Regions:
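Extreme N-terminal leader/anchor segments
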Residues: 5-67
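Short coil/linker segments at helix-helix boundaries
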Residues: 30-56, 72-109, 115-154, 161-166
């Protein structure tokens, strides 16, 4: 296993050896402050799945991390949009709704949280939902965008979502 590898191929420095060992939750805790920044870097490097996985690991360690939650919603939403298989699209979009809902529960007046939840529900309505669920989700998206725009009438993302409703 890993001990044989380390014994046969000694590392030049201790950092390399540490990186070769399996990471555990206690080992990852010191790296947590960089988790969101790393996830953003992965996301903007067109790697939404790697970003989502990093954020999911962060949420497992710190479920009340608002920043990780909304970013996980964003990554899952993009994964749902680019997925070609209908079942996997449905799963990703519902994961996006869940993370966005959790983010909103953590910061109920945060316009970004409201907008990401509206976007996730809106995409679910247009891509997956049946007629009844489309109507319900459409009403929820309308209410969420109204709530977001009441907080910040110039919020670009909320206005974009609202524009798609009309």
């Amino acid at each position: 296993g890993i001990l044989v590898f380390l014994a046969l191929y000694p590392a030049i420095d201790s950092i390399t050896v540490w990186a070769q060992a399996p990471l555990t939750v206690p080992a990852v805790r010191p790296l947590v402050p960089t988790a969101v920044a790393t996830a953003d870097s992965l996301f903007f490097s067109m790697e939404p799945l790697a970003s989502f996985r990093r954020l999911e690991a962060r949420v497992d360690i710190a479920p009340n991390d608002y920043e990780a939650r909304w970013r996980a919603a964003r990554a899952a939403l993009v994964l749902g949009v680019i997925e070609e298989d209908r079942e996997r699209t449905d799963r990703w979009l519902r994961i996006a709704v869940q993370h966005a809902s959790e983010a909103l529960a953590l910061q109920p007046d945060n316009v970004d949280a409201i907008a990401w939840l509206a976007a996730a529900k809106g995409r679910l309505a247009t891509d997956i939902a049946g007629v009844r669920e489309q109507v319900r989700l459409g009403q929820e998206v309308w209410a969420l965008t109204q709530e977001a725009l009441a907080i910040d009438r110039n919020h670009a993302f909320a206005n974009s979502i609202f524009g798609k409703l009309n």
